[in-house]
């Protein structure tokens, strides 16, 4: 049977989501799998919606795992996966919280059924830096910026494009993505001035893409790059060394959207299939991040 997890974590002290072979590096996946395997007395292997990098946080992460029915028959669970929330709450470290566990709907795949991922990037340009209470999720940029310039740079990136200039290379993976939303907002307050948030939504993101999108807009916002910088990067055929990558600490995965229950399997099959970019001469395998 398939179980769905809804979870959150502070990525500060993790080496990203993915476990790294036999390494003892602390990753979110390793900590969760170790604890789930101990509770359920079965080997658990997680599939996740967004494989976040080192230092990146999540408030709305989704994962799934498959397990035999008898693993839930122990007295403390009694066949009800939601009871794992309390068990895990007692075992997991303070920087991971599983806030929902339930039977997955037929055809559900945390990664391939996803329609879109929502990220928020939070950054301050104030010389004092972030508030101590927001130091883990707010990055610092060394120069002041103009919000209007950043938004124009972001608008130029919306739609279906090859974002190779903004992505770190990964074998057999396409860099074609549909960027559905890229909106900047001034969220400053009297006690926290010069703070900005970028809300970024796409069907999927390739490795380091969100932080590269943010860094490029910040470069335009501070005047280091011209207003057409981001649009020009869409014509690139490889990753551009001119693209600054914003710090990991400002980025949080805040949500994952899925289709209705009757469309879950169809969506998973579509995502797994070869996706062809209209202007490309070859088809590439989609590899969601």
Curated annotation (Swiss-Prot):
One of its GO terms (biological process) is tRNA pseudouridine synthesis. Substrate binds at residue 119. It catalyses: uridine(38/39/40) in tRNA = pseudouridine(38/39/40) in tRNA. One of its GO terms (molecular function) is RNA binding. Keywords: Isomerase, tRNA processing. SUPFAM superfamilies: Pseudouridine synthase. It is an enzyme of class 5 (isomerase). InterPro entries: PsdUridine_synth_cat_dom_sf, PsdUridine_synth_TruA, PsdUridine_synth_TruA_a/b_dom, PsdUridine_synth_TruA_C, TruA/RsuA/RluB/E/F_N. It comes from the Bacteria. Its EC number is 5.4.99.12. The active site is at residue 53. Formation of pseudouridine at positions 38, 39 and 40 in the anticodon stem and loop of transfer RNAs. Homodimer. Belongs to the tRNA pseudouridine synthase TruA family. This is tRNA pseudouridine synthase A. The gene is truA.
